[in-house]
A protein has these predicted regions:
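Beta-rich carbohydrate-recognition and catalytic domains
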Residues: 1-210
Length: 210
């Protein structure tokens, strides 16, 4: 669903009717987080910034089975009990994430939130999408939690080490002793920890195979 389709979906009368119907459902969850409509999956980019807790998650608003390219949904809270539904934060609207804004994480640095996520691309052709046909790009987003200041690919698919499947996704970022690190899980072959500098974006690959 591209940006125009996303905006149209949010404004559709049937979307409002569906929200109202779901809100009255006897099986709707209230203690645990649940989207207003559609499909919800992995929590992403959990962080606290300027007194607000931000909870992002995999989200397909128009399909409860999740059989569409996922976005990042967004909820906020000041007490971790009451949550407010926010506008969709990230959508698959670029060439590097056109088949899904996959999972990632966030870290606060220099009064900004830095998000890292996997942009999923499935190329046309006779592929199994495990060993061929899939691109997984690591994307960096700078934001205040609501609007996007900058968004760019920092590790394109072709920059990953050779010898792994095309399933290279869901970067986890963290800080230790003044240095910032990223862990990217891989299918079958274990993990490749990548240390990085948010300022100059120089990457160092350390291969760890099981």
């Amino acid at each position: 669903m591209d940006l125009c389709a996303k905006e149209a979906w949010q404004e559709l009368e049937q979307q409002s009717e569906l929200k109202a119907k779901i809100a009255q459902d006897n099986w709707r969850l209230y203690f645990h987080l649940m989207p207003e409509t559609g499909w919800m999956n992995d929590p992403n980019g959990l962080c606290q910034f300027n007194g607000v807790y931000h909870f992002y998650h995999q989200y397909v608003p128009q399909n409860p089975a999740g059989k569409e390219a996922p976005h990042w949904g967004h909820k906020t809270s000041t007490n971790l009990v009451d949550f407010k539904e926010e506008a969709i934060f990230l959508s698959p609207e670029h060439s590097y994430d056109r088949n899904g804004v996959f999972s990632g994480s966030a870290i606060v640095k220099d009064d900004q939130i830095h998000f890292f996520y996997t942009g999923n691309v499935k190329n046309e052709g006779d592929h199994d999408y495990t060993f061929s046909g899939r691109e997984q790009n690591t994307v960096h987003v700078i934001s205040d939690g609501y609007s996007i200041e900058k968004q760019e690919v920092v590790i394109p698919h072709e920059a990953y080490p050779a010898g792994f499947t095309d399933h290279i996704r869901d970067p986890k970022v963290f800080e230790k002793e003044g240095r910032y690190y990223m862990i990217i899980p891989l299918v079958i072959c274990g993990n490749v920890p990548i240390s990085f500098n948010l300022t100059d974006k120089i990457f160092y690959f350390f291969h760890h195979r099981e």
